[in-house]
Design a protein with these regions (language model features):
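Bacterial N-terminal signal peptides
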Residues: 1-2
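Alpha/beta-hydrolase fold active-site loops
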Residues: 53-54
Length: 355
């Protein structure tokens, strides 16, 4: 995972106001819980005494700073707005900014798992205040583990679909094991999660009305990546390119495929309310989704045996950009959206539920 280069900041200059943050609750060095975070209610965050009727919670993924979490949440809101789906979006911001290496990745998984209870408490408080409102959740990358942990927490206290707690969940490029959504009680689910987290199928079936998994077989953080690079960069007059396939950062550290790259494992049983969708075609080949620091995902080929430092933008084709699910800001006006990414399909599926 240390082979990929991430810009220092993927953040817009304008901060997004609607954030529920548990940052500072966990030690980024060892993942231990150092303080209990008492989150304000959703209505307090929205600065509104009236229930909104419908609310979305967005949960960001691994290695997002506080500012990046705000930027992504705002981008989800703007992308929804572009589809004429105008509802408030609250970002759930958690301690994901561990070291950008395999050790940091493992710590981030632990922190994500432990944040599930915090998210579950936040959800329950909102539904206690606004029992008739539809609550929707969108999670990106490792944020999917936060959400699955939250759903498990709700399931374990007896929440069912009859309680009308979670209307829908959308996972975008989920950085979790492709067996995690199984109805079967597989020991592997328990073994790969710290603290232990059972397979999520029963919790999904019981707690969530509609559950969607958006996967992308070209996602550069999750799937195998074919890199085309100039074999003779010193010669401007030839077109001598080499094709090399590298494992993704996820596949370099995990022993199984991610749910967000190829969908659920074919052998497992999943609940009827679980659906896989291949959204590769919705993720454009634009390398800079937030319009801040250029390419969203670079790799230094020297780390793979190249003789010199050679930074290569891995986003060259449809589906490559792991940060494109939430949409793409406009080059001329970054406060607007030029492409809604996979959020277009999210809004379409919400409308289909209503109709």
């Amino acid at each position: 995972m240390g082979f990929y280069s991430f810009p220092e900041s993927h953040a817009s200059t304008q901060s997004y106001p609607f954030i529920a943050s548990t940052r500072g609750s966990f030690d980024l060095a060892d993942g231990t819980n150092i303080q209990q975070e008492n989150l304000p209610s959703a209505l307090n965050i929205l600065n509104n005494d009236n229930c909104p009727g419908e609310l979305t919670i967005y949960v960001h993924g691994v290695w997002a700073s506080e500012q990046e979490a705000e930027e992504q949440t705002e981008r989800v809101f703007l992308s929804l707005l572009n589809t004429d789906y105008d509802i408030p979006v609250i970002g759930f911001s958690w301690d994901s900014n561990t070291a950008k290496n395999p050790t940091g990745w493992n710590l981030a998984k632990v922190i994500a798992n432990q944040n599930g209870q915090n998210l579950a408490n936040f959800i329950l408080e909102f539904k206690n205040q606004c029992p008739n409102d539809d609550l929707r959740i969108i999670a990106h990358s490792l944020g999917s583990k936060v959400v699955l942990s939250a759903i498990q927490s709700l399931y374990e206290i007896g929440i069912t679909n009859a309680d009308n707690i979670v209307k829908s969940v959308h996972l975008l490029g989920a950085a979790v094991d492709d067996e995690q959504v199984s109805l079967d009680k597989l020991q592997e689910c328990v073994n790969i999660n710290d603290p232990p987290l059972p397979c999520s199928g029963e919790a999904i079936e019981s707690v969530v009305s509609n559950f969607y998994n958006f996967y992308d077989s070209e996602d550069n953080m999750l799937a195998f990546e074919e890199v085309l690079f100039d074999a003779t960069p010193w010669n401007w007059f030839d077109d001598n390119f080499l094709s090399v396939t590298y494992p993704s950062p996820y596949l370099m550290t995990e022993t199984d495929n991610p749910l967000g790259a190829y969908g659920k494992q074919s052998e497992i049983n999943t609940p009827e309310n679980y659906q896989d969708y291949n959204v590769t075609a919705y993720i454009g080949n634009e390398p800079d989704s937030d319009k801040v620091n250029g390419c969203d995902l670079e790799v230094n080929l020297r780390n793979y045996g190249w003789l010199i430092d050679y930074y290569y933008c891995t986003i060259t084709k449809t589906g490559d950009n792991h940060f494109g699910y939430m949409g793409y800001r406009s080059e001329t006006n970054p406060q607007t959206i030029e492409d809604t990414g996979a959020i277009e399909l999210v809004a379409e599926q919400w409308r289909n539920e209503i109709n």
